[in-house]
Amino acid sequence: MLIQFTVENHRSIKNSAVISFAASKDKSFDEYLLRPDEKKTLLPVLAIYGANAAGKSNVLHAMMTMKEMVVGNAAKVSKGQKLPWEPFGGTKVPTSFEMVFIFQGVRYTYGFSFDAKKIYKEYLYHWPNGREALIFSRENGVYEFRENVNEQVTLSNRTPDNKLYLVSSNDWNLPQTENAYRWFMEKLTFLMDEEPATSETVAQIVSGDDKKARILKELMLADLGITDVTIKNTSGKIPVITTTHRIINEDGTTEYFQLLMEQESVGTQHFFACIGGWLQALENGALLVVDEIEDSLHPLLTRRLIEMVQDKAVNTKGAQLIFTTHDAMLLDLNFFRRDQIWFAEKNDETCATELYSLASFSPRKGENVRKGYLQGRFGAIPFIGGDA
């Protein structure tokens, strides 16, 4: 489970910005809360609102870049190869990422600073017995270790300046860093691109009857009129996806007809693309990161997807969700807690993205926060009109 994410100097984000799943003292919807241990209570869902170009998607992009550098293509760098550095406004200072998370009952803090050429700083801490303990740290090429020192010194000497030590240690199956690496690999998932998302749904349908049945159940609950889905040419790059629909005639007889997925509505295609990854995240207890959750979906379908994560009867493994949205219908204190709603706003003077929670405004219980948001009380909306 993710506790918090911090990013500094990435795209439109200049200064350190923190988004936190730690629950406040708000007592509303206590049944939503995740409790990984006796002391910690975490939120299952966070929503980020903001005007176009305010930078809310850049928060999620920073999370995705961090994962890419740990377990993705950017982790496979060779010596001298450039890193995916996208600083604010062309500044020359390093970018920093940090994740605080819980994996297998242990809290970890992992972060690093980098530019296009090298890793300047990297560190990993854990709390195995409730106390902070260093696993490794690295700053300007100088490493510090607490266990298996000789082995890790040898490994650090083989780690080029532009490669994360967490990646190198995983390459060499170092047990001290295995769990942190596994969290990025297994528990951090993204629905940022339609094609990979669709691939996940297709993979689940062809993997077995149980997963296909679960997907069909959700498609039917969504009232899309789909009774079956078939996949052909799964060995090729582009599978042929066919949906089956049922018609009940006036005389009571039943007929079936089929459509190619590309003949379905855009909303149906988007829901189909999402649902496989959604169910997989719930099954794995993963964090799901989604940009523009409402894209082409009916508001009730969007709400259904969120409810699946909020409802502990469905979300039995402690999955979490963070998403960006413009859907003001979700701004409802009868649906979300105050600490679940966040805003991204671009500073008028610096053009840098700033993040803050609705909880910082202390709205009253039952207050119409949707109306307050659209009236500009909480910021993070476009300024329309005025002098050109």
Tell me the role of every PLM-derived stretch.
Residues 1-4, 235, 243-245, 303-388:
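C-terminal lobe/lid and adjacent interdomain/linker elements of RecA-like ASCE P-loop ATPase modules
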Residues 1-65:
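Pre-Walker A-like glycine/lysine-rich segment at the N-terminus of P-loop NTPase domains
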Residues 7, 97-102, 243-245:
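Short beta-strand segments that buttress and anchor functional surface loops
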Residues 12, 103-107, 129:
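Glycine-centered tight beta-turn/hairpin loop motif at sheet-sheet or coil-to-beta transitions
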Residues 36-47, 51, 60-119:
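Conserved P-loop NTP-binding catalytic core
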Residues 45-49, 234-279, 283, 287-300:
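Conserved ABC ATPase signature
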Residues 91-92, 103-105, 279-282, 311-317, ...:
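Conserved catalytic network of the ASCE P-loop NTPase/AAA+ motor domain
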Residues 109-235:
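Electropositive, glycine-dotted interaction segments
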